[in-house]
Amino acid sequence: MKKTLRSLGIRLKEKEYGLNVKPLLRVVLAQFFGPPSGFVDMVVEHVPSPAANASKRIQQIYTGPLDTEIAEAMQKCDPEGPLVIHVTKLYDNEEATGFDAFGRVFSGTVKTGQTVRVLGESYTIDDEEDMTMQKVSNAWIYESRYRVPVDGVPAGNWVLLGGIDSSIIKTATIVQQKWKEDAYIFRPLRFPTAATLKVAIEPMNPSELPKMLDGLRRINKSYPVVTTKVRIIMK
């Protein structure tokens, strides 16, 4: 192994040759590829910060006027401004009994125990039917396999929220419970491709229809591109 590593320009200390496979591989790859900060360095160099890019992003996805206090707070990425969160994805909770909402905080600071308004995709200032009041039961910094619990998350960050998913179908806009200005939503997500597969299903046992419908609703909430429709055919 020493000969092979030296041919690659990798030189280890004598004690490192006695390491187990996993830590030994880590040491070898660290010398071969260099420090693991390359991706982070690339992000810092080329990806604009939330504060620098907020104004451009708001103009693309926000449906409300841009001369309001809410819009100005979002464009400044103000952690002290009115709360506005764009929920873009739902993930199964750890017990698989419901969903947690993943979104970006554009303004304000969301805190656990806070009561918020959840605005659905069909909400408008003239028709507030698609709006519910929900209490944030948990807040996490979501890191794929890991969820880091936090008391609050300020503007400019992504957050995973528990306890607010019941009325969310695909995406939603979260705003604080009370504010002096009208609330507007973010545009629903748009995808460049449409679904290419259509499947008709029915339960083998008609009495299990409610279970199947509940499963379809969960699929509809889990996958943004999926569309489910229920048709009752009388025979």
Placement of each model-derived feature along the sequence:
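Structural and coupling elements of P-loop NTPases
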Residues: M1-K235
